[in-house]
Curated annotation (Swiss-Prot):
Residues 217-410 form the Helicase ATP-binding domain. ATP-binding RNA helicase involved in translation initiation. Remodels RNA in response to ADP and ATP concentrations by facilitating disruption, but also formation of RNA duplexes. GO terms for cellular component: cytoplasmic stress granule; spliceosomal complex. ATP binds at residues 230-237. InterPro entries: DEAD/DEAH_box_helicase_dom, Ded1/Dbp1_DEADc, Helicase_ATP-bd, Helicase_C-like, P-loop_NTPase, RNA-helicase_DEAD-box_CS, RNA_helicase_DEAD_Q_motif. The gene is ded1. This is ATP-dependent RNA helicase ded1.
Length: 675
């Protein structure tokens, strides 16, 4: 048996994988990664070149064979040089010393964030990335795959463009107050915008700026601070991305500060120095802003990054190390990264607070003040600060005094109201009848578009989505107890139409721009009318039309008066049962004369011109919530100031007797579970 197999003639030095032909005449085996090398065997079976002489480590030690590919015989000899060492003067890029000379260590050759080599040497950072070289912006090459990912194909249902009523935006009233307000623009042109940005705007199929963009672009390009109020879905994200990206393309990156004496860099620079910082309240909103930033920074030297809580911090750190020029962040995670020494704000030129009122509602004011006032961010006079939101109650405008300088106040449309593109319907439905009425509505409207259903509790979101699945309706749910991966997957399935019904808690109510939502159903009405405004604002975006249905019963009578006013403002039909319940008197003492957050008489006006320059009485206090309030406190926490008062209402910002119902870190539940 052994003789027939010639086992006795075998030796360790002989193998069919040897570089010489074996006894059967077959060609020598060449590993796949070496088959195209000139020193390898030809495809017709010609013998391979002899291997290099063994090094001092012995014949079997590939680590000691300097003539072979580094990393051993399994390494890809054609792989790029990832060493942080600088190039050899004679052009040799391998690790092997040449002619007895060892290359000097170059700490900027690899992993320099912020510029990726483009600031100094001008090298591109990756496929499709541009560079800044010799004081000029050089766009990168086009990449069809990336373009398809960012901008979609023509008529792509997942990419929403302007709707049939977009032209009606020109009729929306605009108020801009401040000194020397720049004239608005009417088109995406150069000047004031950079040509490369205009090319990306064209790829995104944007044709005409929205009213907020018409005013915000020249205001920001002229170096002014801005506080902008606009309806949801009116293009606020483009309102701040367009001007800051355009100026970045024209002015280039800022130099990285030199390390302090005694500090050394070991190749990869661990601290990032972004020039633009965008703060937003939730993971979903920062992810959405990041996607828009990637779109309009396509083929440029600007590298956007996003960081938020609830996700793996290691992957976010690696993303930052590869380069971070524009950072989109939630306040909590940003404070964490600053404490770790991984992000410095010393180079910040632009600070943007998006959905600022929601961030204060969620109890983020201490983190925001620490980021803006307690770290190394430039002084208010040395940066541009922009605030964007759909509502600006008085406490936000008071915050603007500390963060903004000589700002322009921009109010577009009836801020805090709803779009006339949304057809609003209010149905009287008792709690035990809601599921059957919901099924009737879904059967009537079908699943041709996307339907977003809002509920108040996480348990109800899971319960209702399971019920719809049992009724053969493709539904999914999103709420704060889901992991980040589950939430992202649910949103992706909803956006793509594979699961056209999404049941959500308020986590998805503000800021999310989900294309082609045709129907919003308020299964549970919120207790605050502003939350209702932002919920139904998920449809009827960018001039498209939509339907909003609300289930109302006597348990919601606290918002009946505001709801009636809202329907009248938007020229919608007011059901008779709403008027009847309002006349019963229960709805007329609940809000202190229509004084909810953001919906007081002055919520859309420049407070510098109201009440003696921010010194007058608040517009949303009153006796309905515990008597007169002093200064700007007390509206939600009895008569005590809402900033640290002892009453601590459900929306308070501290206080020993309560805590923020929306995740105030001082509240009884600790930090919020939403973000």
């Amino acid at each position: 048996m052994a003789d027939s197999l010639k086992m006795g003639s075998l030796s360790l030095n002989e193998s069919q994988h040897a570089p010489a032909p074996n006894s059967s005449g077959r060609a020598a085996y060449i590993p796949p990664h070496l088959r195209q090398r000139q020193t390898g065997a030809n495809m017709d079976g010609a013998p391979a070149a002899a291997p290099p002489a063994p090094g001092p480590s012995g014949p079997g030690n590939s680590w000691g064979s300097r003539g072979g590919p580094r990393g051993g015989n399994w390494a890809n000899a054609n792989a790029p040089d990832f060493s942080p060492r600088g190039p050899n003067p004679n052009g040799n890029t391998s690790w092997t010393p040449t002619e007895g000379s060892r290359r000097s260590f170059n700490p900027d050759a690899y992993g320099n964030p912020g510029h990726g080599g483009s600031y100094g040497g001008g090298s591109a950072r990756g496929s499709g990335d541009g560079q800044w070289r010799d004081g000029k912006h050089i766009p990168g090459p086009a990449n069809a795959r990336v373009e398809r990912e960012l901008f979609g194909l023509p008529n792509d249902p997942t990419k929403q463009n302007t709707g049939i009523n977009f032209a009606n935006y020109d009729d929306i009233p605009v108020e801009a107050s401040g000194q020397n307000v720049p004239e608005p623009v009417n088109a995406f042109t150069n000047p004031p915008l950079d040509d490369h940005l205009i090319a990306n705007i064209t790829l995104a199929h944007y044709q005409t700026p929205t009213p907020v963009q018409k005013y915000s672009i020249p205001i920001v390009m002229n170096g002014r601070d801005l506080m902008a109020c606009a309806q949801t879905g009116s293009g606020k994200t483009g309102g701040f991305l367009f001007p800051i990206l355009s100026q970045a393309f024209q002015n280039g990156p800022s130099p990285t500060p030199a390390p302090a004496s005694g500090q050394f860099s070991y190749g990869r620079q661990r601290k990032a120095y972004p020039t633009s910082l965008i703060l937003a309240p939730t993971r979903e909103l920062v992810s959405q802003i990041f996607d828009e930033a990637r779109k309009f920074a396509y083929r440029s030297w600007v590298r956007p990054c996003v960081v938020y809580g609830g996700a793996d911090i290691g992957s976010q750190l690696r993303q930052i190390e590869r380069g971070c020029d524009l950072l989109v962040a939630t306040p909590g995670r940003l404070v964490d990264l600053i404490e770790r020494g991984r992000i410095s704000l010393v180079n910040i030129k632009y600070l943007i607070l998006d959905e600022a009122d929601r961030m204060l509602d969620m109890g983020f004011e201490p983190q925001i003040r620490r980021i803006v006032e307690g770290e190394d961010m430039p002084h208010v006079n040395d940066r541009q600060t922009l605030m964007f939101s759909a509502t600006f109650p008085r406490d936000i405008q008071m915050l603007a005094r500390d963060f903004l300088k000589d700002y322009v106040f921009l109010s577009v449309g009836r801020v805090g109201s709803t779009s006339e593109n949304i057809t609003q319907k209010v149905e009287y439905v008792e709690d035990h009848d809601k599921r059957s009425v919901l099924l009737d509505i879904l059967h009537t409207h079908g699943t041709s578009g996307l339907t977003l259903i809002f509920v108040e509790t996480k348990r109800m979101a899971d319960s209702l989505s399971d019920f719809l699945l049992n009724q053969r309706f493709p539904a999914t749910a999103i709420h704060g107890d889901r992991t980040q991966r589950e939430r992202e997957r649910a949103l992706e399935m909803f956006r793509s139409g594979r699961c056209p019904i999404l049941v959500a808690t308020a986590v998805a109510a503000r800021g999310l721009d989900i294309p082609n939502v045709t129907h919003v159903i308020n299964y549970d009405l919120p207790t605050d009318i502003d939350d209702y405004v932002h919920r139904i604002g998920r449809t009827g975006r960018a001039g498209n039309t939509g339907i909003a249905t609300a289930f109302f019963n006597r348990g919601n009578r606290g918002v009946v008066r505001d709801l009636i006013d809202l329907l009248k403002e938007a020229h919608q039909e007011v059901p008779s049962f709403l008027e009847s319940i309002a006349r019963e008197g229960s709805g007329y003492g609940g809000r202190g004369g229509r004084g909810g957050r953001g919906r007081g008489a002055n919520a859309t006006r420049d407070m510098r011109r109201v009440g003696g320059g921010m010194g007058g009485p608040p517009s949303f206090g009153g006796s309905s919530y515990g008597g007169p309030s002093a200064g700007y406190g007390g509206s939600y926490g009895g008569g005590a100031p809402s900033y640290g008062g002892s009453g601590g209402g459900s929306y308070g910002y501290g206080g020993s007797g309560g805590g923020g119902g929306y995740g105030n870190p001082s509240g009884p539940t600790g930090p919020s579970s939403w973000w």
